[in-house]
Amino acid sequence: MITIDEQKCTLCGECVPVCVRRILQKGKTSVEIIDPAMCLYCGHCKAVCPADAFQFSEGNDQFLSVPNKKQIPSPAVFFRFLRRRRSLRFYQDRLVEKTKLKMLIEAGRYAPTGSNRQACEYVVVSGRKALDKVCTLAIRNLQEQGKELQKLIDEYSRKKKPLPEEWASRQTLPPVWERIAGKWEEGVDQLFHHAPALIIIHMNKGIATTPEIDAAIASTQMVLLAETLGLGTCYIGFLIWAIENSGELKKKLGISPENKALVAFTVGYPKVEFLRFVARNPAKVGWVGEFEG
């Protein structure tokens, strides 16, 4: 619910043009809300109001002052910071504090979402005992998927038929999953890399308008904040495949049947200090308009 304190409103009109749904207009004594039900709750109006006349029934206390320009890092510094983040697969045998894990969740919570649905939900698995149980279930499922996939690959090969696109991209994975399973039996964790914590983002796709994008943005903010906390992270795409293929694993993680796991990443203190940035391929860019050609 959004309301306007008429005593505070100065009719400056700053809020009217920034309203995404165009439901604000100047009245005689204050700005008026034409159709409250259409409000997106994006907070633009409250964020620009010099008099702080807008009130939200939820989250009103979260509209804090933004940092001044001097507190924002320069483009060069920020770009180098972005490049600093890399996949970490070597972790110290050290528990990540709950306070830091909660900070990562907060970073995800404040990420933008399609139509402001804010549908992201999180599972935090902490400690090797709990992680080992999840890892065992995940590897077992991946191994089963690998065997089924290999049967299909062999069948299509015998018939000399091309694999369907969805399988073709995974045809190299069965031996990878077998190797991961074999190493796990030897006590080597090649799925979670012996990390002390794991975070999974999931959501009800019936609520979210852009679920995959929302989860990706939230996780990006989280892994970047992790860098400032002295933590490293690594995305674990194989786990998502396992969760969505195993009702047992989904239940173990407390993810509702109607929700879909979208992103998973490990978290922990680095065991190795990297001295150089990671290399990337050149960007493929098509310019349209002013800079075309």
Predicted segment positions?
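Acidic, surface-exposed loops and disordered segments
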Residues: M1-G293
